[in-house]
Amino acid sequence: MKYDHLLVRYGELTLKGSNRKKFVNQLRNNVNKSLKGLDGFVVKGKRDRMYIELEDHADINEITYRLSKIFGIKSISPVLKVEKTIEAMSAAAIKFAQQFEENSTFKIDVKRADKNFPMDTYELQRELGGTVLKQIENVSVNVKRPDHEIRVEVRLDAIYMYEEVVPGSGGLPVGTGGKTLLMLSGGIDSPVAGMEVMRRGVTIEAIHFHSPPFTSDQAKEKVIELTRILAERVGPIKLHIVPFTELQKQVNKVVHPRYTMTSTRRMMMRVADKLVHQIGALAIVNGENLGQVASQTLHSMYAINNVTSTPVLRPLLTYDKEEIIIKSKEIGTFETSIQPFEDCCTIFTPKNPVTEPNFEKVVQYESVFDFEEMINRAVENIETLEITSDYKTIKEQQTNQLINDFL
């Protein structure tokens, strides 16, 4: 079947009333960015639907795949656009039915947005179904559990007919919900947290704390790869890599061993808070899950949050670990996240970290040293990378160069 359009159905943005135009425009911009590099199509965003007009050479499978990854899209269908006549609809219905397997069942489903069309829904269903039965042998009607469903949408401008409905990612268009800073550790949880907030229309930049030589270049490249996977959905993402060795060593020098984990997280939050204001973000996002580890109890969260007035969003707060793993596999980050390269959260880990830290004690331990200068120095020396979906690490670039030189 040669389709001439893709029908793109909006997600929750259809509920946005007077703000709908803003959401539709943002989604259209996101679609154009996602489809960059492809040709043979024209995007037409309308109030209730988006239509993508296809030329003969358009790569419909690649276009559909990319659309399915864009937040704000509920579903996509390859469609035939036909004239608003029963003859044109009947001819298209026969085209669809000619693709059916022998002895298969079908159903005609009609949605009539144009209430002025001369035939009502049931008349159209009977007429088109009857035409298929007359013209195509060895098929029958089954309205409850059909093998095939020919869908007909009667709209003001034309008739759109299709069979396939490809699920989209749902949610809201990224860019409609403000900017946040994602604390990206390299584990399983934080990439999922980032994906969850992006699904709500939020733009992210990411921050990663790197402590060489205790953490390796492989750990850094792992985080770059996780950011690249996230960027496949939304376009370029800025990754801010913080030199954290000096701060982490100082914490372990002056803070009681059982409190070093709590204090380390507080230092991370203080650095993140300064960066939030620099980049114009409105919140900090992390992958914390309530009660999962010592640093993620309510007592710990209270002690850590106290260093910032910036809202801290925890989209995975109540998830079971298995739920997070399933989502990680769905979005494609799991295999990268489980690579065995230590991040700064796993080094210097005390044997018995306190699970219910006393806030006054944390402050007392940290008061013996003024960390502000170190924090400012860490912020000043941040390395910022813009990660795109085709970003290559330095190691990959060097490998490619060696191959090219050899050839």
Curated annotation (Swiss-Prot):
Record: residues binding ATP: 183-184, 208-209, 265, 287, 296
One GO location term (cellular component): cytosol
InterPro entries assigned: Rossmann-like_a/b/a_fold (IPR014729), ThiI_AANH (IPR020536), ThiI_fer (IPR054173), ThiI_N (IPR049961), THUMP_dom (IPR004114), THUMP_ThiI (IPR049962), tRNA_STrfase (IPR003720), tRNA_sulfurtransferase_ThiI (IPR050102)
E.C. number: 2.8.1.4
Primary location: cytoplasm
SUPFAM superfamilies recorded: Adenine nucleotide alpha hydrolases-like (SSF52402), THUMP domain-like (SSF143437)
Molecular-function GO term, any one: tRNA binding
Domain (THUMP): residue spans on this chain: 61-165
CDD domains, alphabetized: PPase_ThiI, THUMP_ThiI
Annotated function: Catalyzes the ATP-dependent transfer of a sulfur to tRNA to produce 4-thiouridine in position 8 of tRNAs, which functions as a near-UV photosensor. Also catalyzes the transfer of sulfur to the sulfur carrier protein ThiS, forming ThiS-thiocarboxylate. This is a step in the synthesis of thiazole, in the thiamine biosynthesis pathway. The sulfur is donated as persulfide by IscS.
Similarity annotation: Belongs to the ThiI family.
Protein name: Probable tRNA sulfurtransferase
